[in-house]
From Swiss-Prot:
Residues 4-186 are annotated as: Large ATPase domain (RuvB-L). Pfam families: AAA_lid_4 (PF17864), RuvB_C (PF05491), RuvB_N (PF05496). The gene is ruvB. PANTHER family: HOLLIDAY JUNCTION BRANCH MIGRATION COMPLEX SUBUNIT RUVB, PTHR42848. Its EC number is 3.6.4.-. This is Holliday junction branch migration complex subunit RuvB.
Length: 338
């Protein structure tokens, strides 16, 4: 797996120790939530309406690529509603009892946040349906012929589910969410604002153009932007006086092998393999995985999304194709037969 050594992988477990810093710089209110204007505008209305009616917010599904702020948005919703939030994830809820324990401890209008909700087991999902729809918990007591079902009334609550794979949710679960929000990759100017805000929270001396340099290479992802900012800070403190200007940011990011487009060595390895080994494509995913020594799932879930979104790679029925933009980026002449 490449996650362990990729600085720009959105879900890199190596950087879990930096979660404390992430929480410190994470916005707490919608007013501080940068970018995703359509989401912010809609949520302001939905939250205000729920507050005016003094009721729980409708169940909310948030989906999109990793690192775009799904957890941040869930916490903001709880803060704006002035309620408690309990956080868990799909893989952790192995048994129906695990979910029941969480649900029965919720107070009125509280938020239950389930990350990776697409990984819920069918047994747990079945328990969730009546809880979401009727605020009731159906539990089986006993086994065999003596088994009986009891119903437990739950207080009104808001379930917030987050996923990178909305298509993997079952239709019955997806249809029970009253609000659905898709998070998109961030514009550079929004990321620049996020980097500048994070620098201020960390007490860093940073020029706006320095923040822009970090934002340009952050792959449209706030989590990556904040991670790069911390590494640029390290470089500025060791190699200079701690002040981050565009030149310092550029040198630090080049040292990290993150180029002007936010590509690291794995992105370049993938695109170059298609162009140099397969004549630009089309090439099947399994052949591509073998060529670069990576797993199919890693290529599809980690490497490809950003390259496709930025127009450097195309998925076609016949396989993957490197685009004209990819050839231009690397300064390679496109084969005459393409």
């Amino acid at each position: 797996m490449i996650e362990a050594d990729r600085l720009i992988a959105p879900d890199n477990p190596v950087f879990k120790d930096e979660d404390v810093i992430d929480r410190a710089i994470r916005p707490k209110a919608l007013a501080d939530y940068q970018g995703q204007d359509h989401v912010r505008g809609q949520m302001e209305i939905f939250i205000k309406a729920a507050q005016m009616r003094n009721e729980a917010l409708d169940h909310l599904l948030i989906f999109g690529p990793p690192g775009l702020g799904k957890t941040t948005l869930a916490n903001i919703v709880a803060n704006e509603m002035d309620v408690n939030i309990r956080t868990t994830s799909g893989p952790v809820l192995e048994k129906a009892g695990d979910l029941a324990a969480l649900l029965t401890n919720l107070e009125e209008n509280d938020v239950l946040f389930i990350d990776e909700i697409h990984r819920l087991s069918p047994v747990v999902e079945e328990v969730l349906y009546p809880a979401m729809e009727d605020y009731q918990l159906d539990i089986m007591i006993g086994e065999g012929p003596a088994a009986r079902s009891i119903k437990i009334d739950l207080p009104p609550f808001t379930l917030i589910g987050a996923t990178t794979r909305a298509g993997s949710l079952t239709s019955p679960l997806r249809d029970r969410f009253g609000i659905t929000q898709r998070l998109e990759y961030y514009k550079v100017e929004d990321l620049q604002n996020i980097v500048q805000r994070s620098a201020d929270c960390l007490g860093l001396s940073m020029e706006s153009q320095g923040a822009l340099e970090v934002a340009r290479r952050a792959r449209g992802t706030p989590r990556i932007a904040n991670r790069l900012l911390r590494r640029v800070r390290d470089y500025a403190e060791v190699k200079g006086d701690g002040h981050i200007c565009p030149e310092v940011a550029d040198k630090a990011l080049n040292m990290l092998d993150v180029d002007a487009k936010g590509f690291d060595y794995m992105d370049r390895k993938l695109l170059l393999a298609i162009m140099e080994k397969f004549g630009g494509g089309p090439v099947g995913i399994d052949n591509m995985a073998a060529a670069i020594g990576e797993e199919r799932d890693t290529i599809e879930d980690v490497l490809e999304p950003y390259l496709i979104q930025q127009g450097y790679l195309q998925r076609t029925p016949r396989g993957r194709i490197a685009t004209d933009r990819a050839y231009l980026h690397f300064g390679i002449d496109k084969p005459s037969n393409r």
